[in-house]
């Protein structure tokens, strides 16, 4: 049975009662999310991350990598972009030619994106790249090294796409469902397309946390049936490191 919405205190004239707002104490929410993640894992629960490329652009890739390495993420669902930008950052230090550590533009950095795609093609796959020691850190690296399943679903705008990307949408959906089976918590970060798609595959008793800097994205997800989601309007580059820091303190 789906969790009931609380009925007490529901008043037309209540303040701060929207389901998603940027006007919330971010540090406190990050602490609560960290506690939820730890509690879910202690109970033997399964946590799946649905991620977009902004994780890398905003400098949060290291935090996600750490969560995978520590065993807090049991599956990663994404598109071509997250994998490409993550591998570009891991191998060249840039994301779409921007130096992630200081936001400056790298010399000839516009080539890095396609160079990364070509490097994966030369290796044959992401896992081969790890085996060949051409990829030594990052989100995709941690997935391969820690046997965390990942599914990359293709879309019409993809560059490449990488060999690991499933371009048949129906097949990608099936693979998403396999990873989502028995999930206790799903964390959706900075991807409207994959978040809404995943939300449509989940039963109402799965805890969903959606983090995006765009409030309409969070609202759209809830409006399309994933009403049990906790919506957090925040910059993932600040929020995910806060969550990782809290987990480090508590674990």
What do these predicted ranges mean?
Residues 99-251:
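C-terminal functional extensions of proteins
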Residues 2-4, 59-63, 86-92, 162-165, ...:
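Short acidic, glycine/serine/threonine-rich loops at helix termini
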Residues 25-40, 217-222, 239-240:
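Structured alpha-helical segments in the cores of large, soluble enzyme domains
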Residues 47, 65-68, 72-118, 188:
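Active-site histidine-anchored catalytic micro-motif
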Residues 6-22, 43, 117-123, 157-159:
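Gly-rich Lys/Arg/Thr-decorated short loops/hinges at beta-loop-alpha junctions or inter-strand turns
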Residues 52-58, 81-84, 158, 191-195:
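Gly/Ser/Thr-rich loops at beta-strand to alpha-helix junctions
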Residues 31-47, 67, 142-145, 179-183:
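Glycine-rich phosphate/diphosphate-binding loops that line cofactor/substrate pockets in enzymes
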Residues 1-18, 25-32, 140-145:
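Short, compositionally biased "basic patch" segments
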